[in-house]
Swiss-Prot record:
Probably functions as a manganese efflux pump. The gene is mntP. The chain crosses the membrane at residues 6-26, 37-57, 71-91, 101-121, 131-151, 162-182. GO terms for cellular component: plasma membrane. GO terms for molecular function: manganese ion transmembrane transporter activity. Its main location: membrane. This is Putative manganese efflux pump MntP. Belongs to the MntP (TC 9.B.29) family. Keywords: Cell membrane, Ion transport, Manganese, Membrane, Transmembrane, Transmembrane helix, Transport. It is found in: Cell membrane. InterPro entries: Mntp/YtaF, Put_MntP.
Amino acid sequence: MTFEQLIPLIIMAFALGMDAFSVSLGMGMMALKIRQILYIGVTIGIFHIIMPFIGMVLGRFLSEQYGDIAHFAGAILLIGLGFYIVYSSILENEETRTAPIGISLFVFAFGVSIDSFSVGLSLGIYGAQTIITILLFGFVSMLLAWIGLLIGRHAKGMLGTYGEIVGGIILVGFGLYLLFPI
């Protein structure tokens, strides 16, 4: 792979990773420990490897059929997660809130990585480029998720108890933006 071929992949990786960064800002406003932040970032990175790989395997011919559906599903998942965070921060006390682990973490990671499925569909299967592409997508998304989570964690300290509500609203807003781009 030449440098000229790598540049568009790096740009795509950052574009896909910005979803993870944006929603991680909101998720970071939950009371997360550094270990959880590391785990969340790795999970998002893994999903950003798996989803485009699945898309590449299915190939370019499915891109038009599932591109809009994948985009819609990702937006709905983010909106649902955002409402859940707002709901849990209002109705539950600090001790009973669930951390983003288990199924909620997988829903979150799936939601921010579903767009990479569509990108994988459009890229198709290109041998060695497939490996480089999916590893690049995963690494950049993991890195941007960590940055977003850490910034969100810092912002929560400044916002106090309302930080989690703001984080949920950010997720809902981002999901609505995906549904109704300005």
